Amino acid sequence: MNPGIDLQGTFIETVQSLGIPAGAAKALWMPLPMLIMLLAATVSVLVVVWLERKISAAAQQRIGPEFIGPLGVLAPLADGLKLVLKEDVVPAKADKLLFTLGPAIVVIPVFLSYLILPFGQNLQITDVGLGIFLWIALSSVVPIGLLMSGYASNNKYSLLGGLRAAAQSISYELPLALSVLAVVMMSNSLSTVDIVNQQAGYGILGWNIWRQPVGFIIFWIAALAECERIPFDLPEAEEELVAGYQTEYSGMKFALFYLGSYVNLTLSALLFAVLYLGGWEFPISLSVISGLIGVPESTPWLQLIFATIGIGMTLLKAYFLIFLAILMRWTVPRVRIDQLLDLGWKFLLPVSLVNLLITAGLKLAFPVAFGG
């Protein structure tokens, strides 16, 4: 296991070397990870929106965004600026308090979930021992905001969209949690860092995708449903509900929903990479690479290179999954609401439960391979 680089310790030592007391150095560090997280999540949304528009254009034999910056890279920024500057309209008969709180309750838990995401051994905001439990708890808050937004709009399409969104989120949260618990069982920990470390040592052969072939499929399907991506975009089906729970929203409040959907997609892809694709781990073990080049793995400059490339590996795996999600938008049709709920309750839930029981049995029978 690569011990990695302690960014917090390095930052505090560097600041102390400038004559600043230790307490002040720690106080300077505290807001820094949060600001980096907010900035990184926002930039990732801009990248994903640009990718979606370009890939969608390619699927339809169009060019897509082209003139707003090189290759249209500034088009998402222009979209965001337009939404921020638009008038914030509240329907006359809407419940103004719930109408305002709804988007915030949807977006804030998604951003807080980034707290547990590791990009390296010490490259995360906080390594809480109950990281997976915290993520599941935060994700369970989102349906409340969706239902509040649909109800508060005083619009039949918004209400139906909110009810659909809440039902869909609750239906797929259980299979999602059970598939993740199988990984937690093998790792003997709820920490995302420990889950990645459990996959280290054997390169690509040690990744959980091989030990959880059913679990990773369940996780991906449930994650797409939680993100309301096609074929599971029932809450905002344009042909049926105009825009679902977002129908009456405009300006900054609509921008929060727009931002939250893409932040959630990026979060799901990053979690998939951490849980099943080894996170920052290379397809070839780091010990093998250091042996081939004849440099000890503990060498500081080599650790710095590994940490930098490790961030790239995590993002590469995540963006590959995002590419698949965008591609699915143009290759599969939308399911009906009854098919959606049947898939969640009658198929994914029992299969994920059986997968968890089988994982427990394999853990007892083959403790070395399944983390006994």
Curated annotation (Swiss-Prot):
GO CC list: plasma membrane-derived thylakoid membrane
Source taxon at top rank: Bacteria
E.C. code: 7.1.1.-
Keyword match Cytoplasm: no
Biological processes annotated in GO: aerobic respiration; photosynthesis, light reaction
Reactions that this protein is recorded to catalyse: a plastoquinone + NADH + (n+1) H(+)(in) = a plastoquinol + NAD(+) + n H(+)(out); a plastoquinone + NADPH + (n+1) H(+)(in) = a plastoquinol + NADP(+) + n H(+)(out)
Keywords of the record: Membrane, NAD, NADP, Plastoquinone, Quinone, Thylakoid, Translocase, Transmembrane, Transmembrane helix
GO terms assigned for molecular function: NADH dehydrogenase activity; oxidoreductase activity, acting on NAD(P)H, quinone or similar compound as acceptor; quinone binding
Compartmental location: Cellular thylakoid membrane
Topological type in the membrane: Multi-pass membrane protein
Enzyme type, top EC level: translocase
Transmembrane intervals: 31-51, 65-85, 97-117, 128-148, 176-196, 254-276, 304-324, 347-367
Alphabetized Pfam families for the sequence: NADHdh
InterPro entries: NADH_UbQ_OxRdtase_su1/FPO, NADH_UbQ_OxRdtase_su1_CS
Family designation: Belongs to the complex I subunit 1 family.
PANTHER family: NADH DEHYDROGENASE SUBUNIT 1, NADH-UBIQUINONE OXIDOREDUCTASE CHAIN 1
Role description: NDH-1 shuttles electrons from an unknown electron donor, via FMN and iron-sulfur (Fe-S) centers, to quinones in the respiratory and/or the photosynthetic chain. The immediate electron acceptor for the enzyme in this species is believed to be plastoquinone. Couples the redox reaction to proton translocation, and thus conserves the redox energy in a proton gradient.
Subunit annotation: NDH-1 is composed of at least 11 different subunits.
Protein name as catalogued: NAD(P)H-quinone oxidoreductase subunit 1
Organism: Leptolyngbya boryana (Plectonema boryanum)
Name of encoding gene: ndhA
